[in-house]
UniProtKB/Swiss-Prot annotation:
InterPro entries: T_IF-3_C_sf, T_IF-3_N_sf, Translation_initiation_fac3_CS, Translation_initiation_fac_3, Translation_initiation_fac_3_C, Translation_initiation_fac_3_N. This is Translation initiation factor IF-3, chloroplastic. It is found in: Plastid, Chloroplast. The keyword Protein biosynthesis applies. It comes from Galdieria sulphuraria (Red alga). Keywords: Chloroplast, Initiation factor, Plastid, Protein biosynthesis. Its main location: plastid. One of its GO terms (molecular function) is ribosome binding. GO terms for biological process: ribosome disassembly. PANTHER family: TRANSLATION INITIATION FACTOR IF-3 (PTHR10938), TRANSLATION INITIATION FACTOR IF-3, MITOCHONDRIAL (PTHR10938:SF0). IF-3 binds to the 30S ribosomal subunit and shifts the equilibrium between 70S ribosomes and their 50S and 30S subunits in favor of the free subunits, thus enhancing the availability of 30S subunits on which protein synthesis initiation begins. SUPFAM superfamilies: Translation initiation factor IF3, C-terminal domain, Translation initiation factor IF3, N-terminal domain. Monomer. Pfam families: IF3_C, IF3_N.
Length: 181
């Protein structure tokens, strides 16, 4: 039910005022070829649109006088929806990919994790690298700091880090952002 109300609200934002529902006495008219026709009384603008068998659509009510366009409303509405769909397609959502490891990690395992991070960063994702401690291992935090410095150095060509590292319980993590090219 909640999704339908969201859709309805987004539809209302895209609704345009057309023809007799325009309540301004004087308007600036743009025709279907994007030429400015000038400033008209609303009655004359409606007659002009009716003669061309098109609609009068309020484009901008913030200007003085408000801007209206003489166009086919159905085609205009379709074009607006198509534009919004295209804009939505082009949006890229940044996701956070997490790579977990221990502070004592072998060279090959380390290289595998670095390669994963490189792959994620090239795709434009943020990478969260977590170092996990078990039991009393938390006392070896200096070894973890050295590992984090090594990771930062290994990925310095592709990533920049927000902070040096954050400590959360028995985990230490660092957030890496892809470098802007």
């Amino acid at each position: 039910m909640l999704e339908k109300s969201k859709q309805k609200n987004s539809f209302d934002k895209n609704k345009f005022i057309i023809n007799n529902k325009i309540s301004f006495p004087i308007v600036r008219i743009i025709d279907e070829n994007n030429y400015q026709l000038g400033i008209y009384k609303i009655e004359d603008a409606l007659k002009l649109a009716e003669e061309k068998n098109l609609d009068l659509v309020l484009i901008n009510d913030k200007t003085e006088p408000p801007v209206v366009r003489i166009i086919d409303y159905g085609k205009f509405k379709f074009a607006q929806e198509k534009k919004s769909r295209e804009a939505k397609k082009k949006q890229h959502q940044v996701t956070v990919k997490e790579i977990k490891m221990r502070y004592k990690i072998e060279d090959h395992d380390y290289q595998v994790r670095i390669n994963q991070a490189i792959k994620f960063l090239k795709l434009g994702n943020k990478v969260k690298i977590s170092l996990t401690f078990k039991g009393r291992e938390i006392q070896y935090i200096d070894l973890a700091e050295k590992l984090i410095e090594k990771i930062i150095h290994s990925l310095s060509s592709l990533a920049e880090h927000e902070k040096v590292f954050d400590k959360e319980g028995k985990n230490i993590y660092i957030m890496l952002l892809p470098k802007k090219t």
